[in-house]
Amino acid sequence: MVITASRKEILEQRGVVKLSAQTNKWRKGDIHMGIIFHEETKTFHLTNGEISYIMTVLPNGHLGNLYYGKAIRDREDFSHLLELVQRPMFQYIYDDDRLFSLESVKQELPVYGTTDYRAPMVEVLQPNGSRISDFVYVSHEVNAGKPKLESLPATYTENDDEAETLIITLKDSLTGIKARMLYTIWSDRPVIAKSVEYVNEGTEAVHLTTAYSMCLDLPDPDYQWMQLSGAWARERHIITRDLEQGVQSIGSNRGNSSHEHNPFIALKRETTDENQGEAIGISLIYSGNFKIQAEVDTRNTARILAGINPDTLDWKLEAGEHFQTPEAVVVYSDQGLGKMSQTFHRLYQKRLARGEWRDKPRPILINNWEATYFDFTRDKLIAIAEKAKECGVELFVLDDGWFGARTTDHAGLGDWVANPDRLPDGIIGIADDIEKVGLKFGLWFEPEMTNKDSDLYREHPDWILSVPGRHDSHGRFQYVLDFSRKEVVDRIYEMMAKILSTARVSYVKWDMNRSITECYSAALPADRQGEAFHRYILGVYDLYERLTSTFPHVLFESCASGGGRFDPGILYYAPQGWTSDDTDAVERIKIQYGTSMCYPISSMGRHVSVVPNHQTRRETPLRTRANVAYFGTFGYELDLNRLTPQEIEEVKAQVRFMKEYREIIQYGTFYRLASPFDQDECGWMVVSEDRKTAIVAWFRILYTPNNHFTRMKLHGLDPDALYSCSVIGGQALTVSMTPDGRRIYESVDGAEDQALVPVLEGPACYGDELMNLGLITSDTSAGEITGEDNPCGDYDSRLYILKAE
């Protein structure tokens, strides 16, 4: 296939040349790129000029890891990198060899109980009760492009020149189990994607009780482990600690990836910051129970495992059956956490998210939930929509409460038919009404749930996950449907498809408001109950795939009580997700900063809500609420009819601003400038692809009087370009100075009906100055009233718009 011009340009800028039209091999200087195999030494070298991943077949036939990191020159023999030493208390493989022990070897598919005492990547429980396996190299193949994973989300290619995939087959001869290990390397990204397919070619069934997606054995533990953790309403806070001897891990056993831990970690050197130093990012494309674990042994090597949580997995693999693990994505950066994040952003934006909405600017929406909760009528909804239309909003979303007997959270889930008392003309009618107002119409669903007070449950009480004879736990008075059963998924699909095919629905918000308990499926035999959690997630993916394929024009936004399932697996189906149920601007700063470690701006749902905020009771300026929410898909979650005329004018200005800059914000290059986890200020910026426009956000959490001078060093600009700088609070203003030093503020466009927020506009500066000296963010408050209308205080914020002249 023909490589795209843009990809050619990218590769040529890096000095990369394709060797011939008939091969997928490349060269950068004298470094050959692609997947290289040295037959004599049985060594594999995956390289693209940015990274190298080197493996070899070990003396016992297992697959060993020799190197992962910045690209190095290829050679025939890397065997000197295999460290074999005699140590006290080692156990050895061969009678006449006191050097080769798996206890000290870095491996690709480590197993249990054969001289390696570290955690295994796979455990196979056999009919005789043994868990011992011996996966030996059989063969390999190299394919252009990237194969699709069966029934699972994964990254993809659009043409074969983008990547190469190595498939190495290992086999345990006693059981007949094959492990097909998949490694994909991109031509222009420092990325390796890894997964494993297990095939039972034996004659007896076995049980996979551990089946991680990847193992990465590192030669030293001199890294800091970074995780994104928290709870409901404070998801993905950054937690960092040193790796040390022993085991540390994050994971979920809740049935979703969870608010508590995101399926992502980063390993960084102690001196690594946003812009320099080594960092390795590991992200699991999965939405269910997971575990990512680091184990440092007595020889100071570090083993990283990532995949399905083995605590809740017991998969029966019959003869002739196969099992595919989720995909793990590994990113390497030698330019700090910023480069690591940008790599994830571009990959997930362009080669994980799919469909018509992947590259489109996202509509500015208003959601009625915090405006009405369950207390709404058709007329109340129309009034909210009409005011939103006046402000320039594009999409109205009807949230929970429109269906069945749903007037509280005690009833109605599972009955996806409009409540005639609230919506006399049904969803068709309210959708038409909203369209007549001039807005697109969106609708909330919670497909995976039911209430016991529902027609669905009364008809099929055995359709929930529930243990016979045991009490059923509830969350929000609701119960989890057994999505491991095809007939359950079929029924929900039929109800949703009927609405989407008859009503003018342009957007769907898919929610999940509780975790799974009593995970037992009435449709599975006793020896397959350990499959229920994973089969449940496969059912979720199946429903998503059917709906997004049948209704490609519909924009799907995922949600799970906010960010409880904000993960790459769902991003494959829904290009944006509700980042958190916490809409407080101050709390969202940390949540969104942490989320940006892995996820692109275009994936983050962010709304302006009312004050006092419904989650924190905090009051923040309207401009700050907007300045935080701009950096995502943007919308409102309040009743605009309750705002003052001045606030409405400010909202109009916010909507105009977002429409002008949303493509840059959602699809530009994102840089973190100052961390809210380290100080009471935060900064980030987005730069357009041509580097002619940049939008910089600065936030203050708590104000300090008579504060020191502050600057933020910017990134990604053209060092030779001269940038004008406009500072926006609610709208842009210009500033002039009188002879006695007083400032005069004037509206940029002179519109009297806009909210005037006093700000400063700095002089034009060259890109190199802004990147090396920084943008001055000091305020002028002396800690006393001066008569000048200069914004200062808690929860302040500014936007700086830089444009190359």
Sequence positions of predicted segments:
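Aromatic-lined carbohydrate-binding/catalytic grooves of carbohydrate-active enzymes
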Residues: 357-494, 507
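Carbohydrate-binding surface patches
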Residues: 265, 274, 676-719
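Active-site groove signature of glycoside hydrolases
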Residues: 394-402, 492-525
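C-terminal beta-sandwich/jelly-roll accessory domains of carbohydrate-active enzymes
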Residues: 703-805
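Short Pro-Gly-centered flexible turn/kink motifs
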Residues: 123, 130-137, 315-334, 794-802
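Glycan-recognition surfaces
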Residues: 451, 456-490, 534-641
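Polysaccharide-binding surfaces and accessory modules of carbohydrate-active proteins
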Residues: 37, 42-45, 63-295, 311, ...
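Conserved, mostly hydrophobic/aromatic
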Residues: 50, 196, 320, 366, ...
